[in-house]
Amino acid sequence: MRLMVEAHHIELFKSLFKGREDVFALRWEKNGKSGYMPAYFYDPYRFRQHKMNGGTFQNFADKKYKALSDQEIGRHLKGEQLVGLYPLLINNTSWFVVADFDKNDWLEQCVKFLKACEEYFIPAYLERSRSGNGGHVWIFFEEAYPAYKSRRIIIALLEKCGVFSVFDKSSSFDRLFP
């Protein structure tokens, strides 16, 4: 079965998941490890020559960041590739903030955080992580907002609902993006 991704699906994605447009990340897996790295344009023939001379992709100079295009988003929505955004814009603002939760009690702590957001009329959305052993709580902004301010607000909410404390090392709260 082939998935159809229409223009309005791509526009919906772009209306929510806004980040840097000049670069995006692609997920990789190799030898049991995985992660994300920037997507690049490069000449594979020149890279192969560079590699034969002892070079690595990291020190290969003839590469440029690949911009996040509608085509790349379409491939992501079809499941052909996994795209990651760089949410922190050049001016240190972002269109969203995400709280990452892991460990055994992640769901309980996510629910506490969601209730705190609701108490302050902050729309927040829970997503289960790829592993299934954690969650991400997404908060979207109507306009790009200074990242340091959004982080302060979210940390204060996490502390208020008892999910995070600088002294508590057992919290399932892991980090914020950006």
Question: Model regions: which residues?
Answer:
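Signature for HUH/AEP ssDNA processing cores
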Residues: 2-133, 140-156
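Short linear functional motifs in flexible/disordered or boundary regions
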Residues: 25, 136, 149, 162, ...
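Short, glycine/charge-rich beta-strand/loop segments that flank catalytic centers
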Residues: 129-134, 171-175
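Flexible helix-coil linker/hinge segments at domain or subdomain boundaries
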Residues: 158-178
